[in-house]
Amino acid sequence: MSRFVTSVSALAMLALAPAALSSGAYANDKLVELSKSDDNWVMPGKNYDSNNFSDLKQINKGNVKQLRPAWTFSTGLLNGHEGAPLVVDGKMYIHTSFPNNTFALGLDDPGTILWQDKPKQNPAARAVACCDLVNRGLAYWPGDGKTPALILKTQLDGNVAALNAETGETVWKVENSDIKVGSTLTIAPYVVKDKVIIGSSGAELGVRGYLTAYDVKTGEQVWRAYATGPDKDLLLASDFNIKNPHYGQKGLGTGTWEGDAWKIGGGTNWGWYAYDPGTNLIYFGTGNPAPWNETMRPGDNKWTMTIFGRDADTGEAKFGYQKTPHDEWDYAGVNVMMLSEQKDKDGKARKLLTHPDRNGIVYTLDRTDGALVSANKLDDTVNVFKSVDLKTGQPVRDPEYGTRMDHLAKDICPSAMGYHNQGHDSYDPKRELFFMGINHICMDWEPFMLPYRAGQFFVGATLNMYPGPKGDRQNYEGLGQIKAYNAITGDYKWEKMERFAVWGGTMATAGDLVFYGTLDGYLKARDSDTGDLLWKFKIPSGAIGYPMTYTHKGTQYVAIYYGVGGWPGVGLVFDLADPTAGLGAVGAFKKLANYTQMGGGVVVFSLDGKGPYDDPNVGEWKSAAK
């Protein structure tokens, strides 16, 4: 693996090891402190709980109708813009789709670009990217007095870079993924202590998934844990799943595969993370096995489709719960992990993790040991599973919707897109409600055999997608929902239909509001208690990212990326017409181009459009000549 790293010598690093540990702890404390400030949005999900919730309430359900654009910024790129910007100490950091440019703006005058990073990438990465050329965001590390504050980014060509947050200069760069075998990067980096955590992409090309921790200051690899293979590669702790041995323990990363199929077995993780400083565990999900054709890979295919809790320092897995053994539908299990502290049905206080999965089930686990607390359908139209057995953790399949070679499965709900995909959802701790964006889409599935060839798609299925039973199948609308969910009772307080899938996710605030963007190009605000639509605004292109909020000089702002794309937008972006193209997405979203077109940028809102340009001097040119 080639890598360019600017750092001190290995000998000096050994001498500095004790200091590095203390400086890492300092930096992590500083990051936690920044995440608690309403002025900032310093990481995906806002904080380590990954709940996309803000205590801000200057904008509330009583005045949200007064929201107006305060300013905008165009990224100059037209592919899908997922994730959200970061705001740290008066600066906004903006990322883009390929070629993964980064911009820093000062919030006093966002019309002036403080710095920009436009990396030179291997264009071959475009050909092996699965589902548009998206990227899910940036990470911030606050520095430790010796190393400056950093912006961490991933590139589609598999590189990870650390930029000086003040100047944009590259501090280090390292190759994480090999595009020659189809391994790319779309994930947002995740900073914990003195490490930056990086996932992987490419399961559709047979890439074996892994999670890597790098020293945030130098780019040196600290540990790497695989999703499949021998226990030593998986970094299974000696007490792995000790509280839940029925989930499986040792030897299964190879023993649940035929021969060496695990070597090209997928399980990449390109979604979202959460972290609990109390348990020191990083929580994330692994993706689908490869190929999609289930006949070609007998067995449970562990540990794809798994929620892992891994020690942040060592990478060791303390627990792993496989949600969909022997996945048959591409239900990649990488979706958002949201942390909460609630009382269970018996009144016992629990530290919980809630995860809405692509397979149509929303799971809640005890995040200290992985014990399953609840597992409920995201919608009553889910038909691949009848239920989940809480004692064994196993889903109860309906064989009618299996995808074996001797059976042409029709009207499978959910589709391969899942009833939930990469959208980053929110949790309101006062209401104990999760606000989730849903893809209400079903499919027909026709499997076929194919050989593995490195760097080529390794799928083995033709898909046709269309609206779910609650949608309009004649007009191909009603493909999405917004829902308010209680993880303890399993009840949905309210749900609202949308024209298209709600792909980007939601943000909740103490102003009794839930914000989200839509594929047809609206930013919307709903009442947290009732789901009533209180406000909407037409933005320049469809939204596949999630909203964020911050304050600057006493004013609350709400920001969202515009830029349709991602898997739902591949037909529009690449001008495709075959309904089975785009791995089935083109047919489902055949009407999308009637409502929006490509774009790329950020729109920032405030009450009455108040902002930096209320000052007539901001943004004006002044001659230096006397």
Curated annotation (Swiss-Prot):
Disulfide bonds join C130-C131, C413-C442. It catalyses: 2 Fe(III)-[cytochrome cL] + a primary alcohol = 2 Fe(II)-[cytochrome cL] + an aldehyde + 2 H(+). It comes from Methylorubrum extorquens (strain ATCC 14718 / DSM 1338 / JCM 2805 / NCIMB 9133 / AM1). Catalyzes the oxidation of primary alcohols including methanol. This is Methanol dehydrogenase [cytochrome c] subunit 1. It is found in: Cell inner membrane. The active site is at D330. Binds 1 PQQ group per subunit. PQQ is inserted between disulfide Cys-130-Cys-131 and the indole ring of Trp-270.
